[in-house]
Each structure stands twice: as C-alpha cells, then as structure tokens.
Amino acid sequence: MGNEFQHRTVLLDEAVDALVTRPDGVYVDGTFGRGGHSRAVLARLGDAGRLIAFDKDPRAIETAESIEDARFEIVHDSFAAMKGALDARGVGRVSGVLLDLGVSSPQVDDPARGFSFRANGPLDMRMDPTRGESAAEWLARASVQELTEVIRDYGEERFAFQIAKAIVARRAESDRLGPLDSTGELAQIVGHVVKTREKGKDPATRTFQAIRIHVNQELADLQVVLEAALSLLEQGGRLVVISFHSLEDRIVKRFLQAHASAPAVDRRLPIRAADLPRPPLKLLGRMFPNDAEVAANPRARSAVMRIAERVAP
C-alpha cells in the first residue's frame, strides 16, 4: 500500500521503554498493526534477541513480511493463539508481551474495511476479512435481544434496545430495499434513533464499536491473551497493554490487580503473611499520552497504558 492510510503508533517510546529489559530476550508484539512498535523493539534488541508478532489483518501481514530481519517472525493469527503458537515454536518463556488493543488508523480510514461511520463502505468490520462472519451477515440474522445485549454491553449505549428494533425493522424491508450492508445506512439508522448528542462524538460511535467488538470477539480474545501472557512471562518479564476504551481497560485493570494481590485469608487462621504464596505480578503503573502527542494524533486521546512485571516464578 502507499501512504494513503497513515498510522501513528501511540505511546511508542514509552511502550518500548517499559517492555524491553533484556536486549537478548524473546519478545511478543501481539498486535503488529503497521509495525511501529515492532520496529522500535527490534532497534533495541541485540543479535541474540527475538521478536514474534501476531496480527489477524492480511494487510498487516503484508507489511510485516517486508521486514527483512532474522530476529523477527510474523504469525497470521489472533493474539489469542499466542500460547499455542509459541509452544509450536519451542518458546516456553518470554521477556515481554506488548498488546496495543483496538482498531488501527488504516483500518478505520479505509472505507472498504467497513469500520467507519464517516465514509460509506461495505458493512464488514472483520480484522481478517477472509475469516468469520461479517457485520452485515450478523446483522441479517441477530435477534432484537442479541442486538440489544451487544450494543448495550460492548457499546455502553443507553439507546441499545431502540437501535436494535430499528435494525430489525429495516431488515424486514430487505425484499424492497435490499440487504442492510453499508456503513452509511447503518450510521443513518442509528442517527435517527439516538436523539441526544455527545460533544465531539458521532451518535453511531458506540454502536459501531459494539458491533466491531462482537464480530472480532475482541474482549473474549483479550481475556485469553492476558492469561497466556502471564503463563509465558519469565521472572522479570514485562506485560505492557495499551487500551483505547473503558471496556478494554477495565478487563486489563482487573486482571492485573487480581494477579498482583495476595490471596485473601481468614484472619482467624494461624497463617503468617510471609507464608502466603507471592503474587505473580507487580504493578508498575499506568501512563497516558502527553498533550503534544494528543495534539499530533487526536486518536491517542483515550489511550491508557498499563505495565506489570512478573516477580514470582
């Protein structure tokens, strides 16, 4: 591809600084995207270092395959497949795992991918357009209840039921109007239902987010990869996760806190704190983009990066 769809990597230096602790370590970039983080990690690694990256998007794979570096390998799969893929490569432990969640700018900015409500295109929304069910296919069969639950739970949209009913009503007109298969029409349907306006936010934002998360199983895959990362990290290894909305960040925060806290024990039991198993993770804090980065890249505004280190075997 040319330069028509540019992508600015969010928290680039901060993420790589937090991630790379050993130049000769094995690292995982769970979301290659357009390779900003991966290239920066490779620049920090020594000759014995290794980076294994994952992505579902065929265009990301094309970009990754242009990297001619013996220390680098790309896997065309979800980061949820990380544990099995590393096992197959004989990798038992890694020095760091980086996850940059959500959709990338080139995906959003390309109308043909169907992620954006700002430009009309096919209603697809799959990270990998060659696998699974598209958004249009799901919308053509989902019940009002299922639509409501997805839009409410994944979009935190208070008009979820009304939007679901409007989608099903439009579907009933398919014989006359044809299928609901364009982003522009879906955005129009949502816009007619959502009467209130959030400053600076299109009324379709929450619904499109919800459908994208559902189609790509993003939150389920996130739970899987967090568990995988914990099992793969060597002592001293780092987990770095960049989230872009509250649903993702909530899952990450709860997971990290749960594995950085000592187990609760009844005070009446004769057990010393020193005898309790040590929590596997230590929290190293969170970071946000600075004002200059947000000014240069407004999509960075909602980003939050959480960092944890494996401290117990």
Curated annotation (Swiss-Prot):
Enzyme class at the top of the EC tree: transferase
GO molecular function: rRNA (cytosine-N4-)-methyltransferase activity
Cellular localization per UniProt: Cytoplasm
E.C. no: 2.1.1.199
Residues involved in S-adenosyl-L-methionine binding: 35-37, 55, 79, 100, 107
Catalytic function, reaction form: cytidine(1402) in 16S rRNA + S-adenosyl-L-methionine = N(4)-methylcytidine(1402) in 16S rRNA + S-adenosyl-L-homocysteine + H(+)
GO biological process: rRNA base methylation
Pfam family, one: Methyltransf_5
Keyword list, A-Z: Cytoplasm, Methyltransferase, rRNA processing, S-adenosyl-L-methionine, Transferase
Residue ranges of the TM segments: none
UniProt key word Acetylation: no
GO cellular component: cytoplasm
Functional note: Specifically methylates the N4 position of cytidine in position 1402 (C1402) of 16S rRNA.
Entry-linked HAMAP family: 16SrRNA_methyltr_H
Similarity annotation: Belongs to the methyltransferase superfamily. RsmH family.
Identification of the protein by name: Ribosomal RNA small subunit methyltransferase H
Species annotation: Burkholderia mallei (strain ATCC 23344)
